[in-house]
C-alpha cells in the first residue's frame, strides 16, 4: 500500500471501532477511498465518520449493480475535513430480492433528501427514514416504476398518470392545524424554475415552512446513461445550471479523469480555475443585486447588474460565450487563452475592483439594508453542521469549508486561496461572504493570468476502461457541485450522479424561515442564491384563523420592498 494514499488512519479507526464490518476497500485516487461495509452497520459507520472523525456528507446515491454483482448498492460520500483531508465513500450492497437497508437519517440528518431520492428512483427502502414522502417523483407516477433501474423504462416515454389528485402532504413540525398557510408556488419567488413553498403563519409571523421542488425534473442522469457518449455528457453537464454550468462540466470531466487516471495538463487546469472564478463573479454580483431589490434599494440593484455586465464581457472575451462556455472536454480544454484576450481581461478586472468597492461602500452604509438583513434568516451553526450545508451559506454560519481549499482541484493548488467566513449566521453575513469572494475571485483571475503555465491543453490517446468510478467536484458560486461517474462497457456511462450545490442547502431553509415574517421570506430564500426550477405564488396558512390564502409573487415582492399594505389582510 503506497504511503501517499490518504485516509489510511480513517480506515484503521473504522476497523478498530467496528471489527469485521469493513468487507472491502479500494482507493480510486490518492485521496478517494471507498469502503464496503456490512449493511446492518451502515448508520453507525456513517455517524462515526461524520461526527467523530470530522466528515461532512457531500452526496449519497443508489446504483443498480445487478449486472455486475447481483445487488443494488448505495453510496454515502463524506468529505473528511478534520485532520487529513480526503474523501471516504461508504458503500453497502442491498439484496435485489429484499431491497431494504437501514436509514442513516435518524443519526445524520443530512442524509434525508438523498435517501428519499434513492427510494424514488430505485425502490430501495431506507427502513426507519422519518420522512417517507416522495422527493423527486410526481404524485401521479406509478408506484412500482423506478426510473433509474437498468430494466425499468425508456427515458423518452412518460407513463400514464395514475391519479388526478395531489396527494403530497406538507408538514408543519412546530405549529398545529390552527396555523394559516401561505402557499408560494408551484413557481419560485424569483421566477427561475418551479417549486412550491408553504408557510405556516400566525398573523405575519412564520411558525414553520415546508416546500416541494422537482416540478421540472429533467432526468439528466438517465439521459446520460442511456443515450450519450462520455464527451456528450460534458456538454449536457454544462447545461445543468444556467449560472454555474462550467462548474458542473468541470466536476463531471474531473470525475471521469479521476476514474481513468488521466493527468490533465497544468495549463488546462489553470484555465479551468480562471473560468470558474469568472463564473463566481457574475453569480455573486447577481445575488447582491437581487438582495438590493428585495430590500427596496432598486438603484443598488441596477448598479450591481451594471457592474455584473463587465464580468459577462470578461467571459465572452475568454471563451467566446457569455454563459454556456462549452470548453471542457475529458482530458482538458478545447480553447486556449490568447494574449490580447488576457490583457483585456486584466483591464476589466481592475475596472470591476474599483466599481465593486464603490457599490459595496454604499450598500453596507444604507440603513434599510442593515435593518432588513441583520438577524434575519438565521442558520445556526449546529443546524448547518447536521445538514452538511455548502457554499456561502455554511461559511456565513461560522464553518470555513470550501472545496477549493479543502480538496484543491484543477488549478487551485497553484493559486493563492483565502476562505472567507462570518459568524453572524444571517442574511447580511451571507452577503458579506459573497462580497469578499468577489474580491478574492478578481485577485485569483489576475494571478492565474499572470502565472499561466505553458504546455498543451489536452491529453489524448487514452481508452475508457469499464466499471471504473471516481468523484469529481468543483466549488461553484453556491457551494460544491459533486459528480460521481462509473464508466460502462458501451462507450457510455454506467452511472452518473450529479449533485448541485443548492440540493445540499434546501433542507435547512425551513429553519431559516422560522421566527421571521412573511415579508422577509423572499429575502431569506434569495440569500440561498437558490437554483431550482421557480415559483410565482406562495400559500400562506394562518394558524390562528384556520384559513389559507394564495398570494401572487408580485404582491409578496411588493410587500417585501414596501413593508406596508400586507397581502394577508
Swiss-Prot record:
Residues 538-569 form a propeptide. GO terms for biological process: anaerobic electron transport chain; anaerobic respiration; formate oxidation; glucose catabolic process. One of its GO terms (cellular component) is formate dehydrogenase complex. Gene3D superfamilies: Cytochrome-c3 Hydrogenase, chain B, NADH:ubiquinone oxidoreductase, 30kDa subunit. Keywords: 4Fe-4S, Iron, Iron-sulfur, Metal-binding, NAD, Nickel, Oxidoreductase. Binds 1 [4Fe-4S] cluster. Pfam families: Complex1_30kDa, Complex1_49kDa, NiFeSe_Hases. The keyword Transcription does not apply. Its cofactor is [4Fe-4S] cluster; Ni(2+). One of its GO terms (molecular function) is quinone binding. PROSITE patterns: COMPLEX1_49K. The keyword 4Fe-4S applies. It comes from the Bacteria. PANTHER family: FORMATE HYDROGENLYASE SUBUNIT 5-RELATED (PTHR43485:SF1), HYDROGENASE-4 COMPONENT G (PTHR43485). FHL comprises of a formate dehydrogenase, unidentified electron carriers and a hydrogenase (isoenzyme 3). In this non-energy conserving pathway molecular hydrogen and carbodioxide from formate are released. Belongs to the complex I 49 kDa subunit family. This is Formate hydrogenlyase subunit 5.
